[in-house]
Amino acid sequence: MTNIRKTHPLMKIVNNAFIDLPAPSNISSWWNFGSLLGICLILQILTGLFLAMHYTSDTMTAFSSVTHICRDVNYGWIIRYMHANGASMFFICLFLHVGRGLYYGSYTFLETWNIGVILLFTVMATAFVGYVLPWGQMSFWGATVITNLLSAIPYIGTNLVEWIWGGFSVDKATLTRFFAFHFILPFIIAALAMVHLLFLHETGSNNPTGIPSNADKIPFHPYYTIKDILGILLLILSLMLLVLFAPDLLGDPDNYTPANPLNTPPHIKPEWYFLFAYAILRSIPNKLGGVLALVSSILILILMPLLHTSKQRSMMFRPFSQCLFWILVADLLTLTWIGGQPVEYPFITIGQIASIMYFLIILVLMPITSTIENNLLKW
C-alpha cells in the first residue's frame, strides 16, 4: 500500500513542499528565514485576531481599548506586546532574507524574486496601517505625514489624499478603513507567500555557491525540518526576551499620549524598520523628489536581475563584490540611524551622503565591480 501522504490530494501538496522536497545539501542558516517569516506571519495573524476581539476602531475609544487590552483582558498585555514586537522580528527576518537573496544571487529566479518584492511592499503597507490603530500621538501624526506624501503626485495628489483620508484630515473614517486594511492584508500576504513558494519549487532552492545542485539533493525532512525548528526556537526566544524584558524598547514614548490634532510632536518618525527609507525621503529638499526616492529605494530591488553583470551567480567567490555588499549594509544602518535623528546639521549632510551612496552602490559600483571580477577570471 502506498503511503497516504503521497496519494491524498491535500497531503500530497504538503508532502511535496515540506517532506519529500529535494533540497540542496549545502544550504546554510541564511536559508532559515523563509520558514521564520512563515512563523512570524502565523504568529501575527493569531495575536492580531485576539487583539481585534477587544479593539474598537473609533477615534473616541481606540486608545482606551488598547489600554483596556493591556490592563483588563486576560494576558492582553502579552498578546499586545507580542504583536507589536512580532512586527519588529518580522522585519528583521525580512531584511535578512532579502540580504541573503542579494548576496547569493537568488534574484535570478525572476518570478520568485518579483513576488518577494511585492510581498515586501505589502508587509510594509500592513505595518504602516497597523501603527495607526493604537491612536497615539505618533500613530496620528505618522499617518498624517506619510499619507500626505501622496499629495506630491501632480494633478490628482490632493484629491487622492482626501479620498484615502475619507475627509479633510486624518479622522474617524481613516482609522476605520485602516483597521479594515490591517485585517485583510495579512491574508493577502499569506496567499502571496504561497505563490512565492510555488514559483520557488518550480526551480528548487539556490545554494551558497550559486552552482546548480541537481546532482546532490537531500530530502527536506528530517534534515531541514530539524534545522528550521532550531531557527524557530531561537526566533521565539529572542521575541520573548524582547516582550518580557523590554517591550517598549523599539516603540515610541509619544504613542502613550492619546492622539491630539492640535499638538504636533517635536520629532515625527516612523517605526525603526522604516527609518532607512524615511532618511532617504528627508534627504531630498523637494517633496516629489523625496517621494520618488522613497519608492525607488525599495523598487530598486526589481532591477537587481538586470544589474547582475557577473559570470558567477553568488558572491561567495567574489571578494570585491562582498566588500561592496557589506558597505551597502553599513550604509543602510547609517540611514536607519539618521532617520531617527532631528533634521539639523550634521545629520542632514550625513543623510544625503548615505542616500547618494545607497543608489550609487546598487546602480553603478556593483555592476562595474562584477565586470572587473569577470576580467580577473581570465588571468
UniProtKB/Swiss-Prot annotation:
Cofactor binding annotation: Binds 2 heme b groups non-covalently.
CDD domains referenced in this protein's UniProt entry, alphabetically: cytochrome_b_C, Cytochrome_b_N
Record membrane topology: Multi-pass membrane protein
Cofactor: heme b
KW Ion transport (keyword) present: no
Assembly behavior: The cytochrome bc1 complex contains 11 subunits: 3 respiratory subunits (MT-CYB, CYC1 and UQCRFS1), 2 core proteins (UQCRC1 and UQCRC2) and 6 low-molecular weight proteins (UQCRH/QCR6, UQCRB/QCR7, UQCRQ/QCR8, UQCR10/QCR9, UQCR11/QCR10 and a cleavage product of UQCRFS1). This cytochrome bc1 complex then forms a dimer.
Further details from the record: Heme 1 (or BL or b562) is low-potential and absorbs at about 562 nm, and heme 2 (or BH or b566) is high-potential and absorbs at about 566 nm.
Protein name: Cytochrome b
Species of provenance: Capreolus pygargus
